[in-house]
């Protein structure tokens, strides 16, 4: 018996991998535009910490590790540092992004941010409870999440705890 197989090539509605969410109200309080470069993003994180926009428990970058893929939430940052001129076709198919040329610089930056207290202190042992608390209580100013994340709704919960002007927006870096 012969089975015919058909397929329909399609462009999926959602092609985004991760969403970068930033506090609009914090940008307004800092009189800053949405960051479009790594340097502007780091400046925002530093300014948010210095201004203690989330109070004494301010966490500029709320991060957690994903059990199935611990480096998932850093992949957007790592990918932005990759030196595609040095990545071969073989590299692309045989290496993790974390091993590719340029990734080391991304991890140096993340290490610097952690040492400056700009990343959640316990991110490496957080199953999401601490990060979710920081998001809901208004302590955090930035986080990375899957683009289809609709549960829990951090915006509504944060508004209840912080006020109606508290708002997460999707960051679209260039």
Question: What are these language model-derived features?
Answer:
Residues 1-174:
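Extracytoplasmic/secretory soluble proteins
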């Amino acid at each position: 018996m012969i089975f015919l197989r058909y397929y329909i090539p399609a462009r999926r509605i959602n092609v985004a991998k991760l969403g970068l969410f930033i506090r609009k109200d914090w940008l307004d309080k800092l009189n800053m535009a949405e960051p479009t470069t790594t340097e502007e993003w780091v400046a925002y994180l530093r300014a948010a910490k210095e201004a203690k926009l989330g109070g004494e428990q301010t966490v500029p970058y709320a991060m957690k590790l994903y059990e199935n893929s611990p480096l998932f939430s850093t992949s957007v940052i790592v990918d932005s540092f990759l030196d595609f001129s040095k990545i071969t076709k073989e590299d692309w198919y045989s290496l993790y992004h974390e091993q590719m040329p340029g990734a080391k610089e991304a991890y140096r930056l993340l290490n610097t941010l952690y040492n400056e207290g700009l990343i959640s202190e316990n991110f490496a042992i957080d199953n999401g409870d601490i990060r979710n608390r920081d998001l809901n209580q208004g302590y955090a100013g930035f986080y990375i999440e899957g683009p289809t994340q609709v549960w829990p709704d951090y915006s509504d919960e944060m508004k209840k705890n912080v006020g109606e002007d508290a708002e997460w927006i999707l960051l679209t870096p260039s």
